[in-house]
Amino acid sequence: MGITGMVYVVTMVFLLIVLILSSSTVGYDYFQFTQQYQLAVCNSNRTPCKDPPDKLFTVHGLWPSSMAGPDPSNCPIRNIRKREKLLEPQLAIIWPNVFDRTKNKLFWDKEWMKHGTCGYPTIDNENHYFETVIKMYISKKQNVSRILSKAKIEPDGKKRALLDIENAIRNGADNKKPKLKCQKKGTTTELVEITLCSDKSGEHFIDCPHPFEPISPHYCPTNNIKY
């Protein structure tokens, strides 16, 4: 190998090291705990869901996020402790793959690799990631369906005002603003997702930043939101 070739190899190795180091230092400022309404998710899918959807909000994911963006993803794994099988029956209930429940594990693995790996040090390892989600949804009562139900907002297909939905969620989230995602199907706007946001420690609710803009297909209008 000539001098030119050696210089090229050294340069490429250096750039690779820089890339690895930069990817491992991508930070996050807060967590998004996003739950999806199964019925609306299946309505949005071109291929019918393999199983009948429940009229429930279940977990989409817990995502370390950046105020300034972009959000971190696919970060280096620092501590190896695989997901314990004893967690899986609970995860199957609160965190199903709505499109195909026979592929729950693939869904969980994807969420861990893309998002959970970036939650260090708050999220220590894979098992801790899933334990944290179970705790948030059940022990910390961040189940969006129950929060709405307490405010007498049930999944009966009625059309709701945005403010009524937001206020109901605020009552269960220390008066912090959630992030709502909607979709338009024909002339009907459906509520698809609700996100609760917490600080970097995952212990304290914060107002969710970055709401969908009016030009977004996921923007929720002030009235006539079907749930």
Curated annotation (Swiss-Prot):
Q: In the UniProt entry, which residues are flagged as the active site?
A: H60 (proton donor), E111, H115 (proton acceptor)
Asked if the Swiss-Prot or TrEMBL record annotates the protein with the keyword Signal, the reply is yes
- From which domain of life does this come? Eukaryota
Give GO terms for biological process. Answer: RNA catabolic process
EC number annotated for this UniProt entry: 4.6.1.19
Under the heading Gene3D superfamilies, the entry gives: Ribonuclease T2-like
Q: Name a GO molecular-function annotation.
A: ribonuclease T2 activity
Taken from the UniProt record, the cysteine pairs bridged by disulfide bonds within this chain are C42-C49, C75-C118, C182-C220, C197-C208
Q: Which GO terms describe its cellular component?
A: extracellular region
Q: Which reaction does it catalyse?
A: a ribonucleotidyl-ribonucleotide-RNA + H2O = a 3'-end 3'-phospho-ribonucleotide-RNA + a 5'-end dephospho-ribonucleoside-RNA + H(+)
Q: What does this protein do?
A: Self-incompatibility (SI) is the inherited ability of a flowering plant to prevent self-fertilization by discriminating between self and non-self pollen during pollination. In many species, self-incompatibility is controlled by the single, multiallelic locus S.
Question: What family does this chain come from, according to its entry?
Answer: Belongs to the RNase T2 family.
Name used for this protein in its record: Ribonuclease S-5
